[in-house]
Design a protein with these regions (language model features):
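Glycine-rich oxoanion-binding loops at beta->alpha junctions
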Residues: 1-2, 48-104, 112, 136, ...
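N-terminal phosphate-binding or glycine-rich loops at protein starts, especially the Walker A/P-loop
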Residues: 2-52
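Short, ordered loop/turn segments at secondary-structure junctions
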Residues: 13-15, 41-47, 79-80, 109-112, ...
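Short glycine/serine/threonine-rich phosphate/pyrophosphate-binding segments
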Residues: 17-27, 48-49, 86-88, 107-117, ...
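Accessory alpha-helical/coil subdomains and C-terminal extensions
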Residues: 95, 103-108, 114-118, 122-128, ...
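Short beta-strand elements at the ligand-binding edges of bilobed clamshell
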Residues: 140-154, 303, 309-313
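C-terminal active-site/capping subdomain that shapes the small-molecule cofactor and substrate pocket
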Residues: 288-338
Length: 338
């Protein structure tokens, strides 16, 4: 007979990504099979850092056995940061203790990973933590050739959408500018642009300098449009990584009409609040207007449509392995204070 263990908690932080529910499902199934009680914590650290213990739910195999097919997160998610203030961390630890949680699985990106590490350190070994890396941006330092979960599904869905936009551009004989989520990294934009066969794709990694001017980007787009005209085509699709916004001079960006610099709890600019496609569209149209040349451009932003898509088999398979592995790690003998 196995010795009863304390509870294992699961929470999700950061933005949604396809495969979260699959990771939750696999974690719960393996934990329950090891006779561990599992508690799902709603909204990341949002309630824990307030010391609240009521925003939780028991997770059983019956609850999670089919959720691996679903997009989104049954535990929802948030960007609440327990490391901003010592009192927040203290309340988080007190809440975990009150819930009798001695093992914690966190699912999230680099910010959630950092918070998980800090929770583990601050607990002095009382709470052991396993982190499952998640982001559609594919910007975490994983082994070479290994993508973050959710990336392949996001690329798959994004490619289908851009393919539709390419046909729309051809049919209406105009240009579409498509900004794709990805924060500082251009992996998702490049993956979608290459797979869809977009006319051009612009990513921040193309620019070695720390800061660039908006005019550099708009002139690249203008040049592509002119080259297409020489080739006899008046239409095209440009895919642009949202990380371009982080390369721009903040003062120049803030001076643009309709731009408000908003920051999340981890201190990052909310790139989704910056209308990059609209800004680039206006500037490129101004370049052509200076030559008395009218240009029709449609601006589109892709990101929120991708984050809660139903995971493709690759990501379902991948996340089930990650969830299983997280529990096996927590059951293993601690080494070097892990």
């Amino acid at each position: 007979m196995k010795t009863p263990r304390k509870r294992l908690g699961i929470l999700v932080g950061g933005g949604p990504a396809p495969g979260i529910n699959s990771a939750i499902s696999a974690t719960v199934i393996e934990a329950v099979n090891e006779e561990i009680e599992v508690i799902g914590i709603y909204d990341g650290y949002e309630h824990l850092l307030q010391g609240r213990t009521d925003m939780v739910r028991p997770l059983t195999i019956d609850v999670v056995s089919r959720i691996h097919f679903q997009g989104g997160s049954i535990l929802r998610t948030s960007r609440a940061n327990p490391t901003r203030h010592p009192d927040d961390m203290q309340r988080t630890l007190q809440a975990l203790q009150a819930l009798d949680i001695s093992a914690l699985v966190t699912i999230g990106g680099d910010d959630t990973a950092f918070a998980a590490s800090e929770v583990a350190n601050a607990s002095n070994g009382v709470v052991r933590v396993a982190h499952i890396p998640k982001t559609i941006d594919n910007d975490l330092p994983l082994p070479g050739g290994v993508s973050t979960f959710g990336f392949e599904t996001a690329r798959h869905v994004g490619t289908q959408l851009v393919r539709n936009l390419m046909e729309d551009a051809r049919t209406t004989n105009r240009w579409n500018f498509v900004v794709v989520m990805g924060r500082k990294a251009g992996h998702l934009a490049l993956g979608i642009g290459k797979a869809a066969g977009a006319t051009l794709t612009i990513i921040p990694e193309e620019f070695p300098q720390e800061r660039i001017r908006l005019n550099e980007v708009s002139r690249m787009l203008e040049a592509a449009i002119l080259k297409r005209r020489v080739m006899g085509s008046e239409h095209g699709v440009a895919v642009i990584a949202e990380g371009i916004s982080e390369k721009l001079d903040p003062e120049e960006l803030a001076s643009m009409p309709g731009v408000e610099m908003v920051y999340d709890p981890y201190g990052h600019i909310r790139l989704g609040e910056i209308p990059l496609t609209t800004i680039l569209k206006r500037q490129v149209q101004d370049h052509f207007a200076a030559r008395h040349d009218k240009l029709s451009i449609v601006d589109v932003t892709l990101g929120y449509e991708l984050r809660c898509a139903q995971a493709i088999p690759y990501d379902v398979d991948y996340t089930r392995t990650l969830g299983y592995g997280a529990v096996r790690f927590l059951l293993s003998k601690p080494e070097d204070g892990r």
